[in-house]
């Protein structure tokens, strides 16, 4: 592995406005992986923005989805494996057709989300990991590289963790190194069972007006002072012996302007706190190798 650390972000993407706050191409140019959190609309503007990031910046663009509601977790439909296979195959087909770089599974069974049986979830992942992720079939790799398969929120099946490239930990409101240590492998808040620390990315949240991310997150204790928690996560990624993969943000566009509001002044740079976190992890001028094994896909106009 190189010393490069990953910056990941979810984005509620809306191409209906010219504002760079809601345009995909307005994100920081050193951001490694961005995922459509609110779905993807296959239109010309979206295709152009995705292709721009892939070809001009090397950013990997994913789709975030969660197990569909029509797969029951209780009752008669809870073991409908055939339907799960069809759903997974259709999802993969869409990712390839749209020219995206992979898939992010949003799964939070202990936090109000649906909890599928082990067999149901393994059936889903067996299909997805045939085409995506480190275990994908050789025929679906391009120049030895594969599309990404990541999971965020919670993963309890340690035996299947090796099907994923990364576990995205929702380490919201982290206030210290110890709070992040707790979320590492075998910690008491280890929500990514089976994932080594070097495959974990910790994220801060920016999902609503008025939360602390307009100032980079909550106060984080670092080197006898307080800094924004996103910067604390960045320092943790490069300085902690846990050697996690990086850091990131949930709903990035709310961190575009100071105070999480569209009409407030933008700090010295748009996405100021995100850009500084990237700089902490990967200082400008540092030469690194690409670790995000996604393939480039030609997109039709």
What feature does the model see in each segment?
Residues 1-301:
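Secreted glycan hydrolases and related glycan-binding modules that recognize and/or cleave
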């Amino acid at each position: 592995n190189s010393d490069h650390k990953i910056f990941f972000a979810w984005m509620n993407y809306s191409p209906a406005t010219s504002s760079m706050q809601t345009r995909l191409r307005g994100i920081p140019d050193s951001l490694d992986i961005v995922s459509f959190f609110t779905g993807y609309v296959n239109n010309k503007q979206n295709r152009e923005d995705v292709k721009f990031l892939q070809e001009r910046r090397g950013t990997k663009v994913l789709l975030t989805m969660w197990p569909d509601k029509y797969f029951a977790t209780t009752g008669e439909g809870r073991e409908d494996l055939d339907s799960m296979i069809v759903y997974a195959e259709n999802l993969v087909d869409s990712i390839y057709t749209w020219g995206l770089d992979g898939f992010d599974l949003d799964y939070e069974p202990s936090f109000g989300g649906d909890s599928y049986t082990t067999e149901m979830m393994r059936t889903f992942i067996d299909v997805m990991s045939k085409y995506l992720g480190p275990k994908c079939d050789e025929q679906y790799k391009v120049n030895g590289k594969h599309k990404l398969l990541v999971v965020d929120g919670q993963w309890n099946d340690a035996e299947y963790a090796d099907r994923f490239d990364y576990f995205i930990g929702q380490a919201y409101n982290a206030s210290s190194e110890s709070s992040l240590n707790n979320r590492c492998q075998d910690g008491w808040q280890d929500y990514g069972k089976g994932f080594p620390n070097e495959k974990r990315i910790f994220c801060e949240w920016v999902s609503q007006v008025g939360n602390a991310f307009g100032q980079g997150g909550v106060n984080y204790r670092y080197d006898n002072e307080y800094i924004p928690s996103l910067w604390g996560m960045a320092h943790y990624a490069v300085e902690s012996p846990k050697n996690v993969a990086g850091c990131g943000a949930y709903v990035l566009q709310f961190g575009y302007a100071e105070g999480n509001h569209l009409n407030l002044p933008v700090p010295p740079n748009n996405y100021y706190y995100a850009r500084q976190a990237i700089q902490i992890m990967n200082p400008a001028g540092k030469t690194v190798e690409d670790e995000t094994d996604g393939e480039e896909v030609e997109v039709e106009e």
